[in-house]
Amino acid sequence: MPVNATCHPQSGHVYGVGRNMLDKLDDDQYAHRRKINPHYPFHDEGEWELGKFLVENLTQTQMTKFLKLKWFDCPNRARPSFTTKDCLLDWVDSLPSFTPWKVSKLEFKGYKTVHPVELVWRDALEVVKQLFSDPTFANHMTFRPHVAMAKNQREYGDYMSADMAWKIQDYLPFGATQVPIILGSDKTPVTRLAGGVEMHPIFVTIGNIDSEVRSKATLRAWRCVAYMPVVKFRVHPDYQSILQARLWHKCMDLVFANLKVAAKDGCFMPDPSRYIRHVFTPLVAHVCDLPEATMIAAVSKNSSPLTMATRQEHG
């Protein structure tokens, strides 16, 4: 935030001190072991990097084939402590996890699908709490809407410098802090570790984090909250896209149910510096392509997802 900025007078108050994301690592059942070996249950950093590479780049079948290579049979060669794919995945699952993944089976009354519908997801509110309290972003976050001037001209930068942030703050309780929600989705199918079933990832980040930091993939400011199932219904092709769109909205309702409550009623959560804030979570942007934007807005593909302009009025 610029030094000469004028902040909204009713925003960003602190209501005590809590625990940030780093503090909660001590709650893990293996925290005492990781004080000796930070890569536990892996033997060392090198073994952790190997396991991470296998999980991120190979399918489960490929991991099994790799670990059964005769290259590992030589007694003079180092062999990883994990000897099977299941052992590796169990170790990865035992690593500290702040927001657990869930699998929910969904059904549409009156409509059958070729394969069962399974949504892999996390509670979006818990993911946002994790992001908001991550010490990695402590020096790169803004909590108050502001107006910055330079040479008699208004300066615009991140979300908190926009008129929208100021106007939303006017409707929030005294002292509240906005945590603007930014969603991102991509129809690139994900099949690895999903048994060959196609899924589309949904990502979330918060507008408090500086845009330059959000754009760096290595800092993981974008977090995956769900893998949307790609299913085929046993219906006439004319109804296929309608049912798929309805399924998408049903999944989003489930993933973001608690986050919508926080947007309406607010909740308290600690920031990276452990200060507790009264937070509201308005949705301010959804980054996606045009076909998906029309589906989200529930309009036909020839209509504008943002305006009331008709097809004939398009430039």
Regions found by a protein language model. Give the residues of each.
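Long, charged/polar, flexible scaffold/linker tracts and peripheral helical/loop segments
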Residues: 1-315
